[in-house]
Amino acid sequence: MARCRHHSGYLADDEAAHSTYVAPLPKKHLLPEMRPTCKLGRVPHLPSMNQYSEHQSHQQNFRHPLAFGGFLDFLTEGQVLDSLQTVVEQATERLAAMKTEAGVPLVDIQDPVEVPSSRHRSRARPSIDTVHRHRARPTLCAGRPNNYPSCSSSMSDSHSSITAGWLGSHSQDSDLGARGIGSLPPMRDKLLLEKNLKRLLRLENKGKILNQSCSQRDSLLWDSLGSQTSSQWTREQPLSWFSGLLGSSPATPETSELGLGEQEMIFLKQKLNKEMKSLLNQPRPFNLPTYCPLREPHHTLDFLAKHRLFPALQRVVSQAVDKLSHACRHNGFPLFPVTSETIPDLPGNSDLLQPSSKASIPTNREARGEPCDSLTTAYSPKTSHRKSKGRRGSPPNAVQMATRFRLKVTPTQVSNVPISSFHSMQEAPNSEPKLQKQAMASNCNHISQPCHGLHLTLPAPGITVEVASCQGRLRGPVQHRLASPCCLHSHFPFPLFPPFLSLGKSFSTSPPTLHPEVTSRAGLEVLEQPLKGRGSFTHHF
C-alpha cells in the first residue's frame, strides 16, 4: 500500500495532512493518469459509490495541515519555549543539588555527553553548563529557529523577514555544533522589530522627561521587596541595554529644559522616596493603635479638635463654595444659579427646636456682621388660640423659649406717629374685629397717662421694633398698641408685627439713654397676627 504525503517537517502536520481513508489501488493501471502522483503533492481519490463516505473523507482532508506549525512559530516568536526551557533547567539543577541527610545526592544524574554509551551512538542532551555557555542572550526580537523545513516558516520568511547573523558560538569543535543539535540561524521578523523599537523609543523619551525619577522609584521599590529581577531599572545606567542600539546617551536632561512644575514634581518624588526608604529601614514595627470601629469616630473628632483642624476645613469649604458660586460659563451666565439669601420657609413645628440652637444663630451672625434674614413661618389662628388658652393657666416654668433683648425707652407722642403706621394699624383691626375690641378695652385704662415708646432691639442686627407703652412700672402680662411698623434696614420684604405684645415677666423702664438687658420669657403667641393680604408672621424670641 503506497502512501503519498507532503513532508512539512512537523510530525503533527504530516499526521494531520494524511487522510485515514485510503482507496485500494487496482492491480493494473488502465490509464497512465491513474498512477500515484506522489511528486505532485496530492492524494488521488477514486470515485466512490457511497456518497456519505465521500463527504466524510472530504471533511477530513479539509483540515488545515499547518496549524501545529503555526503554533510552534508563535511559541518561538514569543520566547515561550525559551522560558519553558529555562524553567526546566533550573528545576533540574535544583534536583541535582538536593542531598539527603547523609550527604548523598537525592537524584543521581549522569550526563550522557561526559559518559557516552558504547552500544550506540549517543545523541543525548548536552550538559547544563554547555547549554548556558552556548545559549544566545535575549535580543530585541525573538528569533525563529527553523530546525525543520516548515512550510509556514518558509512562507512567512519569504516576505516578512530578514536574515540575521548567527547567535552564539557555533564552532565545529563545540558539543552543539559537532552533534548537529544547535539552532540554525534565526530569522527576525521585521514588523516585530519595528514594534519593539517604537516601544523602546517611547520608554527612552519617558525616561528623559522624568529625569531618572522613574528608575529610582522602581529600583527603590524592587530593592525594598527584595527582588533581584533583571527587568528592574538601575540608577547608574538607566535604559542602558538599548541606549547603545538607538544611539542615545542615558545622560540626564538639564534643569533648564524642565519647567517649574516638573522640577517641583521631581523634588516631591525624591522626597517621598527618601521618606519611604527611611520607613522601610526602621528595625521596629510601627506602633499603631488597634482599630476599633466604635471608638474610631470619636478618636477622629478628638484629633481634629486637638489640632484645630475644624477652622481649616471650614476655610477650605468656604473657599470652594466661593469659587463655585462665582464661576461663570462661557456665555457669562453663572455656573450655579444664585438664589436669594433668605432662609426658606420653615415648617409649622419649628418652635420645637432647642432654645440653644435658636439663640446661637443671631449671635454668630452678629459676630460675623451678616444681615439677619427674615424668619417666616406658617401660621394658623386656631392653633395659636388653642396654645394661648393652654398657656394662660400654666405657670411661668412651662414657657420654653427664653432670650435676651434690649429695651430702649424713647418719649413719643401719638400725634408724631407717621401716617404709614396708622394706615398699617388700621388694616389689622379691620381684619380682626374681636382683637380690635380687646385693644380698645386695654388702652382705656391707660389713656390718661403720658405715653413713651419702647425701642425694642432684637439680638439680630437690622431689625428694630418700636412699641408704645405707658410710663411707670409694668407688672404682669400687659397688652400694648404698636406705635409704628418695624423698622427694617434690609431690602427684603418683612411683614409687620402684630399690635399685641405679651411679656411674661415684669420689667421696669429706664431713662432714654440707658439700655438695660432684661431677660424675658415669651409665649408662643408673642408677635403673632395674620395680616390682610400679606400673609402671616410668627416670631419667637
Curated annotation (Swiss-Prot):
The keyword Phosphoprotein applies. InterPro entries: DUF4702 (IPR031532). Transmembrane segments: none annotated. GO terms for cellular component: centrosome; cytoplasm. It is found in: Cytoplasm, Cytoskeleton, Microtubule organizing center, Centrosome. It comes from the Eukaryota. Residues 79-102 form a coiled coil. Residues 346-397 are annotated as: Disordered. Its main location: cytoplasm. Pfam families: DUF4702 (PF15774). Residues 351-363 have a biased composition (Polar residues). The modification Phosphoserine is found at residue 394. Residues 383-392 have a biased composition (Basic residues). The keyword Coiled coil applies. Keywords: Coiled coil, Cytoplasm, Cytoskeleton, Phosphoprotein. PANTHER family: COILED-COIL DOMAIN-CONTAINING PROTEIN 116. This is Coiled-coil domain-containing protein 116. The lineage of its organism: Eukaryota, Metazoa, Chordata, Craniata, Vertebrata.
